[in-house]
Regions:
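ATP/nucleoside-binding phosphotransfer catalytic cores, i.e., glycine-rich phosphate-binding loops
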Residues: 132, 136, 141-153, 163, ...
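Catalytic core of DAGKc-family lipid kinases
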Residues: 1-169
């Protein structure tokens, strides 16, 4: 028999913290060929045909029917160049696992993909798929204590946009940063917490900017804080968009006629986890 004291129980209970989780729904035009191209990660499930409700945020023409899939994330969702690099790496690791055999080789492969896909040399590349996200996305959010959607402009320099719940992006980095009270007040932000029902939305401009952010010499491009997010993705010249959720990337086919929508809202009841820092 193992005996424990009341102090041990109190210590255990004091280390339990709440963690918000986020429900994501992707609504894409129902096109047979596009759906066949879609290879979803394990964290997402296919819902089939569903109804899309426009709250007045949509800018493009809406299709008659949409195909939906959904999932839940705890850490982050991202769209853009970082997800494209992650997708390329995951594809290579699946096809040729012997190449990704250790931390050093993984880092070299990642570096190769960032250069190949133009993250470091944007100005030298004319391919529209390698330009800023402002060309294809429209960002709408709901702020704290507000039920209305608000359009938020995405800076033209941003090539990856991230919605972050935990301060643990890309192997433990904190790209949002530890912001000073004066800056928080100026921007209308609050101190970021993992259980506050708020996502921090930031952008990464290009490889050099992302590299400095990852070593925490600078912060990412702060865009907004939100309790709900809607992204409208307009195809046009873009055939695909790259997304990832808690490290699982996928290639999202886009329609040339209709928009694809990503809706993110908080799961009503938070999860309970043990804070490892207290143990």
């Amino acid at each position: 028999m193992v005996c424990t004291s009341r102090v041990d129980h109190f210590q255990f209970l004091s280390s339990i913290v709440a963690l918000c989780s986020w429900h994501i729904v992707v609504s894409m035009p129902e096109e047979g060929e596009k759906e066949q191209e879609l290879n979803l990660p394990h964290s997402l499930r296919h819902l089939g045909e569903c109804t899309f409700y426009d709250d007045g945020t949509a800018e493009g023409e809406l299709p008659e029917t949409v195909c939906c899939f959904d999932g839940v994330f705890y850490n982050y969702f991202s769209l853009g160049m970082d997800a494209q690099v992650a997708y390329g790496f995951h594809q290579l690791r699946g096809d040729k696992p012997f190449l990704a055999s250790g931390p050093l080789s993984n880092k070299l492969i990642y570096a190769g993909y960032t250069c190949k896909q133009g993250w470091f040399f944007t100005q030298c590349i004319s391919d529209p798929e390698l330009r800023g996200l402002t060309n294809i996305i429209r960002l709408s959010i709901k702020k704290l204590d507000s039920s209305k959607w608000e359009h938020i402009p995405v800076p033209s320099s941003v090539r990856a946009i991230v919605a972050l719940n935990l301060h643990n992006y890309a192997s433990g980095r904190n790209p949002w940063g530890n912001l000073k009270p004066e800056y928080l007040e100026k921007k209308g932000f609050v101190v970021a917490q993992s259980d506050d029902g708020i996502l921090e939305i930031f952008g990464l401009k290009q490889g050099w900017h992302a590299s400095l952010v990852m070593v925490e010499l600078i912060s990412a491009k702060h865009i907004a804080q939100a309790t709900a997010i809607r992204l409208e993705i307009k195809g046009g010249q873009w055939r695909d968009a790259y997304m990832q959720m808690d490290g699982e990337p996928w290639k999202q086919p886009l329609s040339t006629e209709y928009s694809t929508f990503v809706d993110i809202k908080r799961v009503p009841y938070p999860s309970l986890i043990i804070n490892g820092a207290d143990r």
